[in-house]
Amino acid sequence: MERALEYTVLGALLHDIGKVLHRGEAILRGYRESHKEAGYKFLRDLSLPLLAEFAKYHHEEDLRGLREEDFRAFREVGEEGVGDILRNLLWIVCEADTLSAKERGEEERDFRPSNPLISVFSEVRGIKSEEVGAIESVAFPLNEFGMHLLFPKEDYSVSGEEYEKIEERFKREFKQLVDENMLHPDKVLMLLERYTSFVPSFTTKDNDISLFDHLKMTAAIASCLYLYHEDEIFTGNLINKIKNRNEMKFLLIGGDISGIQRFIYTITSKYALKYLRSRSFYLEILVEDIVEEIIERLNLTRCNILYAGGGHFYIIAPNTERVKEEIRKVREEANEWLLQKFGGDLFLALDCVAFNGDALKNFEMNGESLWNLINKRLGTLKRRKFADILAKEPEKVLLERGYEHNKKECDVCKRAVKKVLNVRKGEEIVEVCEVCERLWHLGDKLPKIEGFLRTKERGRMREVPEAFLEEIEMPFSHFIFIQGLKFPEIREKLMEILPEGSIFIKNSLDIHEEFRRFEVIPLFIADYAVKGVGEEVGEEEKISDLDEIARRSVGAAKVGVLRMDVDDLGKIFSRGLQENKRTISRIATLSRLLNYFFKVAVNLVASGAVEGDEAEKLAEVVRDCPRLRDKRENIVVVYSGGDDLFVVGAWSDVFQFAFELQKCFSAFTRNPHITLSAGFAVFDAKFPIYKSAEIAKERLECAKNEGKNRISLAELPKWSKIGVGACEWEEFMRVWNEYVAVLYEKDEEGQVKLSVRRAFLWKILSASRAYAREPKRVNWLIDLYYYFGRMEKHIGERVLKRFKRLLSLKVREEPQEIYRLWQPLQVLDMAVRR
């Protein structure tokens, strides 16, 4: 990256840094220094005079007040060439700042430093009817971003001590970057994510944009403006051209990998769990490889990535012919590689739409959402897979897609390939394709991975065996998986032999000084998995297989499968925010917080790895959830990110986890318009995993079709005359706590046992089925009435009193309460099986 562009991006990232530095003192001592002056002094004192100018002059009124002699002074403090064009660079950042978020001017008139970051979820409305309940205005506590379980609070104000704590830590680490000559945009971005994700960008009443997202989007827009005007940047004053918001200066690049469902789930049941995780992880790094290649070729930074994960990505870029040509090349090269490796099972749809500066106000062009525009283009490409290659080399597509003799079938993915490799598992030899062979080895090592290196070269990684785990080829690079990064001696050895490249650090925002010559990228992954005993002597513990997991269930030895995602996600982004609030910074905040929940919070809830106040808050949030065991740990997160997840485990633990996660999501968003739906299914351990995933997906669709904000636990019986198969989360928990919870207790071994005769359980289930078959008749009611009368001496008063409520028909309510017991009692019936 050339220096002028790098200064522009760094200037944009740091232009509002004074907001972190002056608010603590303003709260504690009432001292009112402007954020511009605070940022200017901080950067100047670190001998960064050019960057200090961006902190001081990023508002239009200040720039228009500058005189020609001021710009001559800039040339003296700037590097050769950069100081000469600083006027244009300052105007670029000023314009980017305005386009990123238009709320800036209000803070100058209404400075309230103790105001916290309001949850952006509080601004989402209009997704469901207003009857769902009021939207709470809550705020996130000021804290570092990382592996923490954060819930918004009511009536919260930021203290001066909290600001000074963040300020002190940020200053210390930023100074280290300067001292180590590591002041690269991506490292600064990583530092800002850690310390400013929960700092409000403004301190006005509705300050729901984080400082991090505002700085990140300002840098993204600034880089686009610089590259769009690059040919003129040294020719004179470009103020009017920079401020022209009608010109189509920007591109929204969208990427979507199709064939994901087939790639992940179409595998044999043998060793399926290990393959599922490694395949979903493989797709994560495939997306990262493509995204990194795009931003490298376009001379952008990770600031320009709006979202990447789950097989999708969006990037903001300058609208130039070179950029559009590079997008076409990346699409062709990636698809040629995917065709060769996967025979057409995976395909990259990659395209872009142009927009102007005014579109950033509400992320629309001509009244249509930019998301809709780009997704339409991607949909067109997916209907014409490999059209670019077919037009030039049709025989290549035909041959790779299987129209060729002498191919063998991979024992795992069942794909016809030219060559298979033998992999030994105990006494068994399995014939697998090249990709499955790499994923085979990766599956066992996933829990150990601390990071990976993306490089164009292979390097000499095996010279550091204590760090090397695996190497996998991607379309544009090699990914080398490494461990031991917490040990300085291993990091030093790695630096001696590693080629140039990018280092992805898993679930951490730490920047190790040994990595100063690398681009360092945080990658948050929900990868919790219950451990099992290694199959061979001397092996470390590995992920349990499905047979072992099933045996750890409460009651029936079965496997549970859970599919879950956010309801109406497209509506939330396109219509959930009021038109005047659909700024790119707010959209970025919304997207990042959802991804945080599915990457970080899911991992913490699944593992229970929280302590102190976080543990107390989690216990409070999940207090009313169905509970079959105190320690729920036998689950494996196969995939979680963006807005959805797929979890496998002991059926009882997965069942419990589903409700706990829904409760956490509800406590995280505090908005009845933002909900989750889920499909849950139970199977024998030998049942093909891809079929169980399909059934869970069907149940998820059932939950959505019946109104959303629901969980579907069982297929609706054909004999049922009640067309409702899914349960609202709160309704299920109410029924569980009101009726089911009084029917069982847990013994010393953690197993569930009935506190009533099992015949009682079956009788209620029978009545529920009878009602479902003939809801207009009351035979079931009469039957229960006489049954309760006969059983008064055999059933405790507490239980009988609860269940006698079923005898009170609610004329205007359908279905009746007896029907709501059907699925909860089926769950209990499984829990007491031996």
Residue ranges and their predicted role:
Residues 386-492, 496:
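Cys/His-rich short segments
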Residues 706-834:
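Long, compositionally biased charged/polar accessory segments in the mid-to-C-terminal portions
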Residues 338-348, 374-389, 668-672, 694-720, ...:
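Catalytic/regulatory signature loops of cyclic-dinucleotide turnover enzymes
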Residues 318, 329, 333, 680-684, ...:
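Cyclic nucleotide signaling catalytic output domains
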Residues 58, 251, 301-316, 343-362, ...:
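A short glycine-enriched loop-to-beta-strand structural element that forms part of the catalytic core
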Residues 1-10, 20, 29-49, 71-79, ...:
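Alpha-helical phosphate/pyrophosphate-handling elements in metalloenzyme active cores
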Residues 1-140, 145, 151, 199-203, ...:
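Divalent metal-dependent catalytic cores for phosphoryl transfer on phosphate-bearing substrates
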Residues 243-245, 300-307, 339-348, 402, ...:
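Catalytic core regions of nucleotide second-messenger enzymes
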